[in-house]
Amino acid sequence: MTQYNLTQTEQMRRKEIADHTRALVVNLLQVDAEDETSIMCGYRDYYLQISFSELHPLMVFCLAKAITKPNKAKQEKIANELNLRSILGSHAINDEVGCYSYRATHWLDTELNAERFFEMLNRCVDEANRGFLKLAC
């Protein structure tokens, strides 16, 4: 057992799920860069970072896009309102670099196929579009 009370078998199962998902994503998307935890690329007009955690196992989508008309106070209020209604993810504004981001975390309790991966990703993009359109106006 580890400090998280996971058996060796469960640790291996979770690692296999995370490894399988990462390999699937690399085959499905045109990856621009990657490191030990994340894959980065462009997707539907967003900068996309997908990060993986073997321990939990989790897959985290972070979508970011530049905002050309910054209005910090108004946009922070809108982001807070969006977050009150957003169940799966969170909306944020980084006024220092002038970008909007949407972040969503998904449990990987079973291996994904391409159809399920794109369903999850495209739902995140739809929510990011909703947030971006409200914040960019």
Where are these regions (language model features)?
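Charge-rich, low-complexity N-terminal segments
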Residues: 1-49, 84-94
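Conserved short hydrophobic interaction patches
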Residues: 24, 78-85, 120-131
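Short, internal acidic amphipathic alpha-helical interface segments
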Residues: 62-103
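A short acidic-to-branched-hydrophobic micro-motif
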Residues: 50-66
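Well-ordered alpha/beta subsegment
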Residues: 93-122, 126, 133-137
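Hydrophobic residues embedded in beta-strands of well-ordered beta-sheets
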Residues: 39, 57-59, 98-100
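Short histidine-centered catalytic/ligand-binding loop motif
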Residues: 6, 61-68, 110-113, 117
